[in-house]
Design a protein with these regions (language model features):
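Short, contiguous alpha-helical
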Residues: 2, 9, 19-74, 117-159
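An acidic site on a long C-lobe helix of protein kinase domains
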Residues: 4, 30, 91-94
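Amphipathic alpha-helical packing segments from all-alpha helical-bundle domains
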Residues: 6-11, 98
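A generic alpha-helix structural signal
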Residues: 12, 35, 92-95
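A structural signal for long alpha-helical coiled-coils and helix-turn connectors
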Residues: 13-16, 110, 150
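Acidic/histidine-rich alpha-helical segments that form the ligand environment
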Residues: 70-116, 130-135
């Protein structure tokens, strides 16, 4: 599951700050935004499904990023994305913190826990499917965006 986040780290490793903030149009996301948004969404999706507070809340990451406690990046206006200018070090620390928390949380679960329905009216909507679609599917979608943004800047994909 964490291959997507290892890939994010590999993709951003050689980038300069201006490359992290590059947006090909005023409506586009930056690499920095995407590398923050994906673990932020995964943190929320996993911990809320468990009835727990998020790493974002527990460790007050919102203060470190200068954002609201409720911000996830979903629905951000272009000017909000443009104003989002974190350091690579902060992004990496946040991603690694969320990854550790999710790894710890998942390692304490039995495989049958993943079959638990999140909504009694829709028993097919299980925790496992939720993790697969939100954490993995969403992450790989945005990883593709990161690679595209690198390519637009003449940077190769990480190998």
């Amino acid at each position: 599951m964490f291959e997507v986040w290892r890939s994010f780290l590999s993709e951003i490793d050689p980038l300069e700050p201006e490359e992290m903030l590059f947006r090909p149009t005023s409506e586009a996301n930056s690499i920095a935004f995407l590398v923050w948004h994906c673990p932020r969404i995964a943190d929320t999706a996993f911990h809320r499904s468990q009835g727990m507070s998020t790493v974002w809340e527990q460790d007050k990451w919102y203060g470190k990023f200068g954002l609201a406690e409720t911000d996830t990046g979903t629905g951000f206006a272009p000017d909000q994305v443009a104003a989002f200018r974190p350091t690579k070090k902060l992004l990496i620390s946040h991603l690694e913190s969320v990854q550790k928390a999710l790894d710890d949380g998942l390692s304490q679960m039995a495989s049958t826990d993943l079959d638990r329905p999140l909504n009694p009216e829709n028993p097919r909507a299980t925790l496992g499917r939720h993790i697969q679609s939100i954490v993995m599917g969403h992450g790989f979608f945005h990883l593709g965006e990161v690679r595209f943004l690198k390519g637009l800047q003449g940077r190769p994909f990480a190998r």
